[in-house]
C-alpha cells in the first residue's frame, strides 16, 4: 500500500512547486497561489497530468510507474522513496571514499618508490660510505659495466695521481725533521711509481676481483694448512679490540708470511707506492727481484717484512682486490716489528731509510687506500682497530707508529671512499657490489679475498666502534700534534746522537730530554727498542719487550695480553687528561706510599738510588739539553758545582724514574717548549733546582692549553731565581759550610728529588683546584712547592710520633741530606714576577728583637707540637706559621717570601701539603741565614736564633694569607687543615695592589693587633668553630647577641669539624713584643675566610681555655669576591671563629675588645656553651690606615 505521508522536510514538490503546507499532500497549488482553483483550470491540469502520466510518473530509483500525478508526488515525498534515495547516496559516498583512499595509497607508494630510487642513486654517488651502511641499505647487484677494462684502468690510474698529490704534503710534514736524502728518495719513489704504474696497468687491467661467501649458518672448519692461507691480521686487530669483540678467524702464524711474492702481483700503484725495496734498502738495485732476495734474506726479513706488511698491500681495484691482495695492513701489524728491530742490518741501515718509512708507507698506503677502498680489513673490527691505532698516538714507545699514523690520517678518510668492491658473480654476468668492510684477503700469492655472508656481518658494531675511535681521535689529536711539533724541533738533535750512546747513557734522557726523539727519529727507536721500555712506565716496557718477543716468536698469541695492557695504559692516560684532579689525588697517595717504602730511615745511604734516581733522570734531561745550558753554567759561579751533581749520575739508571715517568708522559709533549726556556734558570740554581724547574714545568704543562702561561711562569721563576741566586749565593755558600763538608751529594739529590716529586704532585693538583686570574697566579703556583720544603722540614723535628712514624721514612733522610736542598730550591721562591729591583720593593723591612724571637720560638715550638697532628693535611691554605703570635712570621719573611706573599697566595696551600721534606734543623738554619742575608741586603741586621726558632721561622716565612695581610701564625695543625678553597681565593687577590709596608703599633706594651691579626689565623691551639652561614649577608648587621641565637648547636655539629690535638703547653711567660704589622689589605682581610678546620682540644680543656682568655677570632670569607680582578673565589661565606688563650695578650683589659663587629659572632669553644663572648665594636679611629687601599671594596661596616 502506498505511503501517503510526505517527507516533512521537503518544501518543494517534485515538479518544483513550492509547498507551504506540511502534512498530507492536498494537491498541487494553483499558479496564482490561490488554493481554490478555477474548475476549468483544474480540468486542464488533470488532463495534462493524465497525458504525462505514463511518461512522467515513473520512479527510476524505486522502479515504479504511476499514472496519476498525485500518486507520483506522494511516492516521491514518501519515506520509502526517501530511504532508498539515502541508501543510494551512502553507497555513492562510500565508493568515492574508497576510491580516494586507494588512489592516495597508490600515490604514497609511488612517492616512496621514487624516494628509494633517489636515495639509492645518491648512495651510489656518495664518495664516502659510513661503516654499517652496507648491503642492508643498498642493492648489492648492478648490471655489468660494458667495459671492465675502463673501470680497472681508471681506478688503477687514480691512486697514482692521489699518491703524487699526497707526497708533497707529506714532504711538507717531514720538512723540518727528515734529511734531504729522504726527500730525494721520496721523489724518486714517485717517479718510480709513475713508471711502474704505467707498465703494470696494461698487465693487470683485465683482471677483476672475485669473492666467495660462506653459507649463512655453515660452521666452516678450516684445516690448519688451509687456515694458514687466510691473513691473520684479523687476529692482530682483535688483539687491540679483543676485549670488545672476539676474533672471527682462528689465530694462526700465517700472518707472518712475507708478502714479497706479492711484489710480482702488486698492482700498478702498489708497486709504485710500496716503498720499493731499493728505496728501503738503498744498497739493493732492482725492485722485484731484489725484493725477493731481501725477503729471503734473514737479516733483512724484518725490514722488508715489516715494511711490506706496513705498506698496505692493498691491490688496486683493477686487480679486483683479491688476487693480488696481500692484505696485512700496517695497522694490524704491530709497528713494533719495525720499532723493535733487533737484527743488526736494520739498525745499520741508513737512518734516512728508516726515517723515510713514516712517509713511504704513507705514500703507498694513501695511494692504495684511495684506490683500493674496496678492500678493507678482515671485518670491520679491523677497520675499527686500524682507526683506533691510527688515531691513538700511542705512548712514546710506539712513537713511529704515531708519526706514521699522524701522516696517514687523511689517507684513512680517503681509504674508505669506495665502500663497495666490484665482485664478479659466479656466472660472470653481473658485478656484485660487495661491501668492502667485510672483505679480507689471504696472504697467499694470488691473494684471495674472503668474507662472511653479509647477512651474518655485524655492521652496527663496526659503526659503534668507529664512533668510539673517532672520539678517541679527538682526545689524542692534540696530544699527537703537540708531540709532532716537539718532534720537529728536536729531530736534528736526535739524529746527531750516536745510537750506542743513546742506548747506554741516554735512555734516561730519551724520554725526558728527547721526547721528540722517541716520536720522530726511528733510528733512535730502532736502536733503543728495548731500552725505551725503561723510560716508559712498566706497561710500555712490556710492550717493547713483547715486540721483540713477537718478532722472535712469530707473533705468538700472547701479544693479546700485552696489547691489552698497552690499551689499558692508554686509556688510563686519556682518563688522566680528562679527570686529572681525581687522578692527582690518587697519584699523590700512591707516591706517599712509595716514598714510605723508598725512603726508609735506615736506608738513607741507599736513598739516592731511589729518590735520587728519579731526579737524576730529570737531571739527565737537563744535561742532555746541553746546548741551551752550557752558557748558563758559565754565567753563574756556583752553578758548575751543582751541575756536577748532574754529571755524577751517568752510570746509575734510575729505576724509580719509570714509576714517575708514566705520569709525565702526558706532560712531556709540552714540556719541551718550556724546558728550553726554563733550562737556563734551572741551571743557574744548580742541578737540583734545574730538576725542580723541570718538574714544576711538567705538571703545569699538563694543561697544554696553558702552555704560554706555564712558559711565562717558568721564565719568571727563572728570572726571579737568578736574581735571588745572585743575592743568596754567598749565603748559600756559608750555609753549606755551616752544614759541614761531610754531606753526601747523592743524599741531597735524593732529598731534592723526593721533595720535587711531592711538589710536583701537589703542584699538579693545585693546578686544578685553583682558578688563576693571571700569569702571576700561575707563578704563585710554581713557587708553592718551594715554600713547602723548608716548612715541612721545620715541622718534622717536632712532630708527634704517630705522624712522624708514618712520614719518617720519607722525611728523616738524615740531617745532612737536606742541607743544600732548602737553599738550592729557595731561589725559586722569589716571586716569579719580581725582578731583583722588585724584590727590593716587595721585601718587607722588619725589625725583630732577638728576645722576642726567642720567646716566640719557644711558644711556637710548644704549640707546634700540640698541633702538628693536623699538619699533614694535604691542603694547607694557611701556611703553618709558628704558633708564636705571628709576630715571628712577619719578621722572618725573607724578602723573597714577602714579595711572594703578594704573588704566591697559593703557597699556603702548598706548604703543608708537602710534609715530605727532611727534618733537619740545618736546612732551617740555612733558610734563616738566607732570610737574614736577604734582610741584611735590605738593611736589616741579621740575627741568629736557636734551631727551634729557625724551624718556626722557616715555616713562618712560608705562610702568607694575602699579600697585604699580616699572616698571623696559626697552629700548624690548623694550617694544615685549611681547605682548598682558600687556595682558590688566594690566587686572584695577590697581584691587585702593591705591597703595603708593615706598621708597628704599640699599645701599653702589648702588641697592637690590626685587622690582619684579627683575621689571620692565630697560633692558638684552643677550640675554634667553623660556622658556615649561607645567609651571612642577612645576618651581617645583626648584633652578636642575635647571632648567637641564629647559630644552632645542631648546625654547628653538622658543619663543624673538630680535631682534638694534645692539650696545649702553657703559653710563654715572656710578654709579647710589639708586632711589626703590615698594612692590612682592607678589601679581603676581614672578609676572607680561611676555610680551615681549626684544631680543637677536648671539650673541657677548650671550655676552660675559652673562659680563661678573651677570645680572638677572625672572620674570613674566601668565597665572596671582593675584588673584580679576582675571578676564583670560593662560593660560600663561612665566618670562622677561633677562641684562644691569646685573648688577654691581644686584648688587654684597659682597651675595648678588638673583635667586636656585629657581623662577627664569637662562639665559645664548646659548642654547647650558651653565651658568646661579645666585644663592643671598635671605633674607626683604631684602624685609620685600613681604609686607604680599597675603601670602596670593604664589605664590613662596623669594623672599619
Curated annotation (Swiss-Prot):
Name of the featured protein: Zinc finger protein 804A
PANTHER family for this protein: ZINC FINGER PROTEIN 804A, ZINC FINGER-CONTAINING
Superkingdom assignment: Eukaryota
Zinc finger (C2H2-type) residue numbers: 57-81
Keyword Transferase among record annotations: no
InterPro entries associated with the record: ZnF-G_patch_domain (IPR052445), Znf_C2H2_sf (IPR036236), Znf_C2H2_type (IPR013087)
GO molecular function: zinc ion binding
Primary gene name: Znf804a
Basic and acidic residues biased stretches: 604-666
Upper lineage: Eukaryota, Metazoa, Chordata, Craniata, Vertebrata
Amino acid at each position: 500500500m502506498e505511503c501517503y505521508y510526505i517527507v516533512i522536510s521537503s518544501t518543494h514538490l517534485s515538479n518544483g512547486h513550492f509547498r507551504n503546507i506540511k502534512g498530507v499532500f492536498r494537491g498541487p497549488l494553483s499558479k496564482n497561489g490561490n488554493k481554490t482553483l478555477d474548475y476549468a483550470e483544474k480540468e486542464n491540469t488533470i488532463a495534462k497530468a493524465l497525458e504525462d502520466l505514463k511518461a512522467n510518473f515513473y520512479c527510476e530509483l524505486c522502479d515504479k510507474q504511476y499514472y496519476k500525478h498525485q500518486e507520483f508526488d506522494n511516492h516521491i515525498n514518501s519515506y520509502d522513496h526517501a530511504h532508498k534515495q539515502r541508501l543510494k547516496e551512502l553507497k555513492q559516498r562510500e565508493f568515492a571514499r574508497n576510491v580516494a583512499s586507494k588512489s592516495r595509497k597508490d600515490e604514497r607508494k609511488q612517492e616512496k618508490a621514487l624516494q628509494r630510487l633517489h636515495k639509492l642513486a645518491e648512495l651510489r654517488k656518495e664518495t664516502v660510505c659510513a661503516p654499517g651502511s652496507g648491503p642492508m641499505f643498498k642493492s648489492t647487484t648492478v648490471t655489468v659495466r660494458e667495459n671492465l677494462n675502463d673501470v680497472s684502468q681508471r681506478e688503477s690510474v687514480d691512486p697514482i695521481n692521489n699518491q703524487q698529490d699526497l707526497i708533497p704534503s707529506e714532504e711538507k710534514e717531514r720538512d723540518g725533521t727528515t734529511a734531504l736524502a729522504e726527500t730525494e728518495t721520496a721523489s724518486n719513489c714517485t717517479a718510480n711509481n709513475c713508471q711502474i704504474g704505467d707498465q703494470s696497468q696494461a698487465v693487470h687491467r683485465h683482471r677483476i676481483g672475485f669473492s666467495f661467501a660462506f653459507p649463512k649458518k655453515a660452521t666452516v672448519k678450516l684445516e690448519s694448512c688451509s687456515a694458514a692461507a687466510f691473513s691473520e691480521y684479523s687476529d692482530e686487530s682483535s688483539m687491540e679490540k679483543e676485549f670488545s669483540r672476539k676474533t672471527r678467524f682462528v689465530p694462526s702464524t700465517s700472518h707472518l708470511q712475507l708478502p714479497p711474492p706479492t711484489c710480482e702481483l702488486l698492482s700498478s700503484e702498489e708497486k709504485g707506492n710500496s716503498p720499493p725495496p731499493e728505496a728501503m734498502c738503498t744498497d739493493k738495485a732492482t725492485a722485484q727481484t731484489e725484493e725477493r732476495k731481501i725477503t729471503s734474506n734473514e737479516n733483512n726479513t724484518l725490514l722488508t717484512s715489516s715494511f711490506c706488511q706496513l705498506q698496505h698491500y692493498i691491490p688496486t681495484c683493477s686487480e679486483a682486490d683479491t688476487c693480488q691482495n696481500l692484505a696485512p695492513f700496517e695497522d694490524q701489524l704491530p709497528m713494533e716489528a719495525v720499532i723493535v728491530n733487533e737484527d743488526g742490518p736494520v739498525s745499520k741501515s741508513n737512518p734516512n731509510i728508516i726515517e723515510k718509512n713514516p712517509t713511504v708507507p704513507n705514500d703507498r698506503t694513501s695511494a692504495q687506500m684511495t684506490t683500493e677502498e674496496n678492500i678493507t680489513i678482515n671485518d670491520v673490527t679491523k677497520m675499527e682497530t686500524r682507526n683506533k691505532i691510527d688515531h691513538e698516538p700511542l705512548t712514546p714507545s710506539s712513537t713511529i707508529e704515531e708519526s706514521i699514523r699522524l701522516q696517514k690520517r687523511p689517507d684513512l678518510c680517503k681509504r674508505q671512499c669506495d665502500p663497495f668492491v666490484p665482485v664478479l658473480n659466479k656466472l660472470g654476468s653481473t658485478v656484485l657490489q660487495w661491501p668492502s668492510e667485510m672483505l679480507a684477503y689471504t696472504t697467499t700469492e694470488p691473494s684471495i679475498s674472503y668474507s662472511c655472508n653479509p647477512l651474518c656481518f655485524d655492521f652496527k658494531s663496526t659503526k659503534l666502534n668507529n664512533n668510539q675511535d673517532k672520539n678517541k681521535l679527538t682526545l689524542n689529536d692534540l696530544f699527537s700534534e703537540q708531540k709532532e711539533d716537539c718532534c720537529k724541533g728536536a729531530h736534528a738533535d736526535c739524529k746527531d746522537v750516536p745510537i750506542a750512546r743513546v742506548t747506554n747513557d741516554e735512555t734516561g734522557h730519551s724520554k725526558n730530554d728527547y721526547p721528540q726523539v722517541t716520536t720522530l727519529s726511528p733510528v733512535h727507536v730502532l736502536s733503543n727498542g728495548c731500552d725505551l721500555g725503561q723510560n716508559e712506565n712498566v706497561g710500555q716496557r712490556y710492550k717493547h719487550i713483547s715486540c721483540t718477543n713477537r718478532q722472535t716468536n712469530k707473533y705468538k698469541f700472547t701479544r693479546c695480553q700485552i696489547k691489552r695492557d698497552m690499551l689499558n695504559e692508554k686509556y688510563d692516560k686519556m682518563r688522566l687528561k680528562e679527570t686529572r684532579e681525581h687522578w692527582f689525588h690518587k697519584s699523590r697517595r700512591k707516591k706517599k706510599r712509595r716514598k714510605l717504602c723508598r725512603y726508609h730511615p735506615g736506608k738513607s745511604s741507599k736513598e739516592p738510588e731511589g729518590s735520587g734516581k728519579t731526579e737524576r733522570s730529570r737531571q739527565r734531561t737537563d744535561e742532555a739539553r746541553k746546548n741551551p745550558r752550557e752558557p748558563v753554567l758559565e754565567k753563574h759561579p756556583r752553578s758548575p758545582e751543582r751541575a756536577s751533581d748532574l754529571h755524577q749520575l751517568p752510570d746509575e739508571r734510575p729505576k724509580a724514574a719509570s714509576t714517575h715517568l708514566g705520569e709525565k708522559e702526558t706532560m712531556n709533549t709540552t714540556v719541551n717548549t718550556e724546558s728550553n726556556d726554563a733550562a737556563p734558570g734551572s741551571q743557574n740554581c744548580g742541578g737540583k733546582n734545574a730538576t725542580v724547574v723541570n718538574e714544576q714545568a711538567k705538571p703545569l704543562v699538563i694543561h697544554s692549553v696553558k702552555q704560554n702561561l706555564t712558559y711565562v711562569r717558568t721564565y719568571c721563576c727563572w728570572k726571579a731565581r737568578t736574581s735571588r741566586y745572585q743575592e743568596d749565593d754567598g749565603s748559600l755558600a756559608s750555609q753549606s759550610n755551616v752544614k759541614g763538608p761531610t754531606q753526601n751529594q747523592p743524599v741531597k739529590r735524593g732529598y731534592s728529588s723526593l721533595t720535587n716529586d711531592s711538589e710536583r704532585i701537589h703542584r699538579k693538583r693545585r693546578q686544578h683546584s685553583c682558578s688563576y686570574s693571571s700569569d702571576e697566579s700561575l707563578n704563585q703556583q710554581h713557587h708553592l712547592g718551594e715554600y713547602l720544603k723548608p716548612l715541612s722540614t721545620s715541622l718534622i723535628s717536632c712532630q708527634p710520633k704517630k705522624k712522624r712514624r708514618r712520614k719518617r721514612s720519607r722525611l728523616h733522610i738524615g740531617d745532612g741530606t737536606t742541607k743544600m736542598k732548602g737553599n738550592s730550591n729557595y731561589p725559586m721562591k722569589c716571586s716569579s714576577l719580581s725582578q731583583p729591583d722588585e724584590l727590593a720593593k716587595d721585601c718587607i723591612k722588619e725589625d725583630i728583637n732577638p728576645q722576642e724571637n726567642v720567646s716566640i720560638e719557644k711558644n711556637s715550638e710548644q704549640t707546634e707540637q700540640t698541633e702538628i697532628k693536623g699538619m699533614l693535611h694535604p691542603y694547607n691554605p694557611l701556611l703553618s706559621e709558628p704558633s708564636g703570635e705571628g709576630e715571628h712570621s712577619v719578621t722572618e719573611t725573607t724578602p723573597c717570601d714577602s714579595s711572594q706573599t703578594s704573588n704566591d697566595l697559593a703557597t699556603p696551600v702548598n706548604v703543608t701539603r708537602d710534609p715530605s721534606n727532611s727534618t733537619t734543623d740545618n736546612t732551617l738554619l740555612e733558610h734563616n741565614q738566607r732570610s737574614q742575608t736577604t734582610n741584611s741586603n735590605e738593611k736589616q741586621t741579621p740575627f741568629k736564633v736557636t734551631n727551634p726558632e729557625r724551624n718556626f721561622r722557616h715555616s713562618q716565612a712560608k705562610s702568607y694569607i694575602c699579600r697585604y695581610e699580616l699572616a698571623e701564625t696559626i697552629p700548624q695543625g690548623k694550617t694544615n687543615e685549611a681547605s682548598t678553597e682558600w687556595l682558590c681565593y688566594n690566587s686572584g687577590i695577590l697581584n691587585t695592589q702593591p705591597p703595603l709596608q708593615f706598621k708597628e703599633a704599640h699599645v701599653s706594651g702589648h702588641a697592637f693587633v690590626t685587622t690582619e691579626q684579627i683575621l689571620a689565623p692565630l697560633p692558638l691551639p684552643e677550640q675554634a668553630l667553623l660556622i658556615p652561614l649561607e645567609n651571612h649577608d642577612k645576618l651581617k648587621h645583626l648584633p652578636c647577641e642575635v647571632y648567637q641565637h641564629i647559630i644552632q648547636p645542631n648546625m654547628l655539629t653538622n658543619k663543624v669539624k673538630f680535631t682534638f690535638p694534645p692539650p696545649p703547653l702553657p703559653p710563654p711567660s715572656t710578654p709579647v713584643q710589639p708586632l711589626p704589622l703590615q698594612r692590612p689589605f682592607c678589601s679581603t682581610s676581614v672578609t676572607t675566610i680561611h676555610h680551615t678546620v681549626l684544631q680543637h682540644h677536648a671539650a673541657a680543656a677548650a671550655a676552660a681555655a675559652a673562659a680563661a682568655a678573651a677570645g680572638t677570632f677572625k672572620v674570613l670569607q674566601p668565597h665572596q669576591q671582593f675584588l673584580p680582578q679576582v675571578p676564583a673565589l670560593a662560593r660560600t661565606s663561612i665566618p670562622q671563629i677561633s677562641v684562644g688563650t691569646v685573648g688577654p695578650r691581644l686584648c688587654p683589659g684597659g682597651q675595648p675588645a678588638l673583635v667586636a663587629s656585629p657581623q662577627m659572632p664569637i662562639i665559645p669553644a664548646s659548642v654547647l656553651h650558651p653565651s658568646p663572648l661579645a666585644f663592643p665594636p671598635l671605633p674607626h679611629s683604631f684602624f685609620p690606615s685600613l681604609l686607604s687601599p680599597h675603601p670602596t671594596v670593604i664589605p664590613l661596616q662596623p669594623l672599619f
